[in-house]
Amino acid sequence: MTALKTTPFHQAHQDAGAKLVDFAGWELPIHYGSQIAEHEAVRTDAGMFDVSHMLVTDVAGANAKAFFRKLIANDVAKLAFVGKALYSALLNDNGGVIDDLIVYRTNEAETQYRIVSNGATREKDTAQFHKVGQEFGVAFNPRYDLGMLAVQGPKAIEKLLTVKPEWADVVHNLKPFQGADLGNDWFVARTGYTGEDGVEVILPGTEAVAFFKALQQAGVQPCGLGARDTLRMEAGMNLYGNDMDDDTSPLEAGMGWTVDLKDESRDFVGKAALLALKEKGVAVKQVGLLLEKGGILRAHMEVLTDKGQGETTSGVFSPSLKQSIAIARVPKDFDGDTAKVLMRGKEVDVRVLKLPFVRNGQKQFD
């Protein structure tokens, strides 16, 4: 068996009493004692997550902009200034999702960009970058030397700035989906995966443990993968491998907004397949499900509607709502507000809701 990879924060996790598990070949915390307390810290105060398993790749070259316009379904031409971020799907030729990622523009000349992509898809993402990059002559620099920490919650920025007061002007000026280079390989962006305000900090691996411990002292709760999953589920955010994959179109996974077809002259990987699917008609759509009574919704449960069957793609007990929730794909022409889920052979009633369930600590439905 191959040894699990560790992040630059590994010692800090051990010192904080983390229960470590195998996540896509990485040894990462599932929790530090109480997943529920960690979830609640992010919804009401401040929590932090080690996301160093995600891959930071710096891309440079005279044709870098043209490369990205080919590589991803969203259009980097929208990145109007340095530091602006774009969320996109990375598609295969069949229009399936290889990964979802964020691209930052990192210089004025539009010749340098930074990609942040998922840890579990690292190899196939990199293969796709190189495959598409060949004709554009761009250089890739995977930043294995860096760590990444998400600091999230209504008090996240306030507590972060007690540790890094010199960042105040920069951080206060960041709007959502903007990042800033702080020098010496420190980078901060107003992004996250929780449905709360906060930032993600990319930093030298050598400084990771000290930064983590300083934030702990400032009252930021270390949080594991368990809370990360319940938070992103409440926020209605997709998890790669559950809610979309190589065989799922972004149009079937609530990601249609990330596909930019405005510039008809732009050809991107997977475009022909997406247009063909649009022409034919997308058969399914993504919705949220809420279980009003006991039990837990899980992935791959059958959803029964008056327009046919669907399936849950992720399911969890929501600590904020105190009820079980799921993300599901159902027939496109189903527009009811109730359905049934097959749970241990029984049909159970669920409410059908528009995602997200929770945003900025507030429930998003009546």
UniProtKB/Swiss-Prot annotation:
It catalyses: N(6)-[(R)-S(8)-aminomethyldihydrolipoyl]-L-lysyl-[protein] + (6S)-5,6,7,8-tetrahydrofolate = N(6)-[(R)-dihydrolipoyl]-L-lysyl-[protein] + (6R)-5,10-methylene-5,6,7,8-tetrahydrofolate + NH4(+). Keywords: Aminotransferase, Transferase. GO terms for molecular function: aminomethyltransferase activity; transaminase activity. GO terms for biological process: glycine decarboxylation via glycine cleavage system. Signal peptide: none annotated. Its EC number is 2.1.2.10. One of its GO terms (cellular component) is glycine cleavage complex. The keyword Transferase applies. HAMAP family: GcvT (MF_00259). Belongs to the GcvT family. The glycine cleavage system catalyzes the degradation of glycine. The glycine cleavage system is composed of four proteins: P, T, L and H. This is Aminomethyltransferase. It comes from Neisseria meningitidis serogroup B (strain ATCC BAA-335 / MC58). The lineage of its organism: Bacteria, Pseudomonadati, Pseudomonadota, Betaproteobacteria, Neisseriales.
